A protein has these predicted regions:
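Short, surface-exposed, charged amphipathic helix/loop patches that serve as local interaction elements
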Residues: 1-195
Length: 195
């Protein structure tokens, strides 16, 4: 169903709070309300939740959003741009995989970050990143043996991550950098310079 005044209020209150944790809570609550809790918000990756939210917003308020975007050529002028939300989609990076081979014998299978992983706001930036990485490890493989995340304690996972080389860690970072994301390219000209 589309947004009602109730959902608009939730969104406005979250915007006023200016906290990521409040925005995430609002996103979760709005999707739950508008889908009659038929979507398992806690289990979906963030990019799917963002896409669902955009679709609900498009059907509720309208498909076209008016934005003011900073012009790159002078870094100070803003241009009025319209974006059709029906044209916004989830972008998948070619070659992306959730399977990361760290060595000839050891690999990890990752899951995509979910909304409950993103609300680690009480932690510092570094702790937040490591928290998301730890929570995204789904399996660890050693040869033909597969170990489930549930088989490891928090201490085991911390020790595993601490034992990785910089190269291994870069492979994990690449997983996050290339994972699917909401993206839409908009072409516009600076109203002052016409570039």
């Amino acid at each position: 169903r589309p947004f009602l005044v109730k959902e608009e209020k939730i969104l406005l209150l979250a915007q006023e709070a200016e906290k990521d944790s409040e925005m995430l809570l609002a996103l979760k609550q709005i999707i739950n309300n508008c889908t009659y809790e038929k979507v398992e918000v806690e289990k979906l990756p963030m990019f799917d939740l963002e896409y669902i939210f955009l679709q609900i917003r498009a059907k509720s308020v309208g498909e076209v959003v008016d934005l003011k975007l900073l012009c790159e050529d002078d870094g100070e002028t803003y241009a009025d741009v319209q974006v059709n939300l029906d044209e916004v989609d989830v972008e998948f990076t070619e070659g992306h995989s959730n399977s990361i081979q760290l060595t000839d014998e050891v690999g990890i299978i990752m899951s995509y970050p979910q909304i409950n992983m993103m609300d680690l706001s009480s932690n510092s930036g570094t702790e937040n990143v490591f928290g998301i990485i730890k929570n995204s490890i789904n399996q660890i493989t050693e040869g033909e043996t597969v170990y489930e995340r549930a088989d490891f304690t928090e201490k085991d996972i911390n020790e595993f991550l601490d034992s990785l080389t910089t190269g291994h860690f870069e492979l994990i970072q690449e997983f996050f950098e290339t994972m699917p994301r909401i993206r839409h390219e908009v072409k516009f000209k600076n109203p002052k310079t016409k570039k």
